[in-house]
Amino acid sequence: MRQFDPWPVFFRREWSRNWPFLVGFAVTGAIITKMSLGFTEEERKNSRFAQRHKN
């Protein structure tokens, strides 16, 4: 006898409540990644934030 697997039921039920969070998280991550990769080496060198967090 197969055991009942609750995960598919859980994900199907919770998807309608959680999709805005997941999509927002993905969009925010894509924007941050795109902006970060767009910096030139000169901009990184002159950044006050980067200077403060340099090891």
From Swiss-Prot:
Localization per Swiss-Prot or TrEMBL: Mitochondrion inner membrane
Family membership noted in the UniProt record: Belongs to the ATPase 6 subunit family.
Function of the protein: Mitochondrial membrane ATP synthase (F(1)F(0) ATP synthase or Complex V) produces ATP from ADP in the presence of a proton gradient across the membrane which is generated by electron transport complexes of the respiratory chain. F-type ATPases consist of two structural domains, F(1) - containing the extramembraneous catalytic core and F(0) - containing the membrane proton channel, linked together by a central stalk and a peripheral stalk. During catalysis, ATP synthesis in the catalytic domain of F(1) is coupled via a rotary mechanism of the central stalk subunits to proton translocation.
Bilayer topology term: Single-pass membrane protein
Membrane-spanning ranges: 20-39
Keywords for this protein: CF(0), Hydrogen ion transport, Ion transport, Membrane, Mitochondrion, Mitochondrion inner membrane, Stress response, Transit peptide, Transmembrane, Transmembrane helix, Transport
Entry keyword annotation includes Kinase: no
Residues spanning the signal sequence: none
A GO cellular-component term linked to this record: proton-transporting ATP synthase complex
Coiled coil feature spans: none
Keyword Mitochondrion: yes
UniProt-recorded name of the protein: ATP synthase small subunit 6, mitochondrial
Source organism phylogeny: Eukaryota, Viridiplantae, Streptophyta, Embryophyta, Tracheophyta
Transit peptide start and end: 1-15
